[in-house]
């Protein structure tokens, strides 16, 4: 509760919409609007087929807090221009079909989950949202062949992979933590369409990606930058290894109440770029341990 109170105070939040079970986690000092479930709200709302709304690229769409390497969170303003650029670039790499249905098991409070929802909304494709992760239900949905896209962290895919016997998956975005080579091998044998991905809240998730099935000889890399994204190695050593910097329309302008970054984001990650333009990560954010996409210190 104290962490939530600090974050709400920093962002000057004056009112909060929340479900019943979250009330005890919230400070008494803020006005709250309680609901039983999202379904109960949406079932009573009349909506039009189209929306005559204009979103300016510079307008903030959402503010997401990151658990930074110092342990002190930072607030990232994600703007509509970033999101639009990301969706268009991601679609160029991953493609789009009328049958697309993205299974979302990652949390919406994390950029990996939110990006799935907004990609699907922008593309006009389906998304299936589970209230919580349930391995049996996920496997049932995969084998029903109604799902053809997923975003997962390696820990979850390691649990699922042995039980996947048939599917119509065309994309499995995989990232957020170290990916064991044994998992890549097992997925390759089943022709599971793994796309390794590298990104962060500051870039609205996926920034670098590639298909392991298309480039098996590059399996140690995290892929190539999305269209419009540039990756450069700052202060490289004799082997070309240095700090990874990102620039492009998907990169934030700066943290809230912090100095702007002028379009150049130092990820604090260490790596290099090979002769074919594939990016390799050697050290993630000062030896940070990541579990389930969340930071552990």
Residue ranges and their predicted role:
Residues 80, 200-219, 248-252, 258-260:
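Active-site loops of AMP-binding adenylate-forming
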Residues 1-6, 20-22, 105, 125-145, ...:
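ATP-dependent adenylate-forming carboxylate-activation enzymes
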Residues 239-297:
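Conserved ATP-binding/catalytic segment of the ANL
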Residues 84-101, 109-149:
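Conserved AMP-binding/adenylation subdomain of ANL enzymes
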Residues 61-88:
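Conserved AMP-binding A3 loop
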Residues 1-44, 51:
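Structural core segment of the AMP-binding/adenylate-forming
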Residues 47-65, 72, 95-101:
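Conserved pre-ATP/AMP-binding loop-to-beta segment of ANL
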Residues 148-152, 158-217, 230:
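Gly/Ser/Thr-rich phosphate-binding loop
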């Amino acid at each position: 509760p104290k962490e939530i109170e600090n974050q709400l105070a920093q962002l000057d939040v004056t009112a909060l919409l929340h479900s019943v079970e979250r009330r005890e986690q919230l400070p008494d000092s803020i006005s709250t609007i309680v609901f039983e479930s999202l379904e109960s709200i949406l079932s009573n709302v009349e909506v039009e087929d189209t929306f005559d709304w204009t979103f300016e690229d510079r307008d903030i769409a959402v503010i997401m807090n990151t658990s930074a390497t110092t342990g002190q969170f930072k607030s990232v303003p994600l703007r509509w221009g970033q999101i639009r650029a990301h969706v268009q670039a991601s679609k160029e790499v991953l493609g789009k079909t009328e049958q697309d249905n993205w299974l979302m098991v990652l949390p919406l409070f994390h950029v990996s989950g939110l990006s799935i929802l907004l990609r699907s909304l922008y593309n006009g494709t389906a998304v299936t949202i589970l209230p919580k992760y349930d391995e049996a239900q996920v496997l049932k949905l995969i084998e029903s062949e109604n799902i053809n896209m997923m975003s997962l962290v390696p820990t979850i895919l390691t649990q699922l992979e042995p039980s996947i016997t048939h599917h119509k998956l065309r994309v499995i975005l995989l990232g957020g933590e170290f990916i064991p080579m044994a998992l890549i091998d097992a997925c390759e044998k089943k022709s599971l369409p793994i796309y390794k991905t590298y990104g962060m809240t500051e870039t609205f998730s996926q920034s670098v990606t590639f298909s392991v099935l298309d480039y098996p000889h590059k399996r140690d890399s995290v892929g190539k930058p999305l269209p419009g994204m540039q990756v450069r190695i700052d202060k490289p050593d004799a082997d070309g290894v240095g700090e990874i910097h990102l620039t492009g329309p998907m990169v934030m302008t700066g943290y809230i109440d912090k100095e702007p970054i002028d379009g150049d984001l130092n990820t604090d990650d260490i790596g290099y770029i090979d002769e074919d333009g594939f990016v390799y990560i050697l050290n993630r954010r000062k030896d940070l341990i990541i579990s389930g996409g969340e930071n552990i210190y």
